Amino acid sequence: VSDVESAGKVAGQIYAISTLGSLVGTFLPVLILIPDIGTTRTFLVFAGILFVIAFAGLFRVNAKLALRYVWMPIVITLLAVFLLNGPLRPPAPNATLLYEKESAYNYIQIQEDDKGYRYLYLNEGQGIHSQWHPTQVFYGRTWDFFLTAPYFNEPPFTPDQVQSLLIIGLATGTIPRQYINVYGDIPIDGVEIDPQIIEAGAEFFQMNKTDMPSLTTYAQDGRYILNQLDKK
């Protein structure tokens, strides 16, 4: 910067680059990188880009000094190859990791314990979002309480009066499986915003047309589906 005019030009260029970087940094990871390569590798990709930019700038100023840092990306790449092959979060004790995926919405894990129970964990893994067992339907957890929902209708009310069900927040199908066992093969609409969770449910929780033919799944926002469905 040699004068006021060039200072304004440089400042404008910096702000333009900053704005472009903000847009790329906002949309590229969320829409492309994280769903395709995961959070950890996304960090490594952006770290590599920043290193290349910094290295190029330093090389223009002092090539000899820049060459001292060539080893850094090589070491980081080798460490990533050898240390990042395992799961982001290890499974619980006495459990096996069956499925791990980072979608556009969630970090998804499915684990199976030594008694054959399968569990759906999302993101930080503090809560169980769905549970499944080949021979059991009721687990003494939160989902069991939803079976009482029809009895909030005006009495007298009998189980055969339950004609259909809408679930917003389907996860991998614990609630519809329970409803089918209690109230029969009633039509069920299940809404889950994350299509990867629906796919995992079909593969690992029997949430498919063969085992739950009366269940229709929607990979949509719940508010949108409420406005689109004409059932009451």
Which stretches of residues belong to each language-model region?
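Class I S-adenosylmethionine
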Residues: P73-D189, D194-M207
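Membrane-interfacial entry segments at the cytosolic side of transmembrane helices
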Residues: N62-V75
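S-adenosyl-L-methionine
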Residues: I198-K232
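Active-site-adjacent beta-strand anchor residues
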Residues: P35, I168-G169, V191, T216-A219
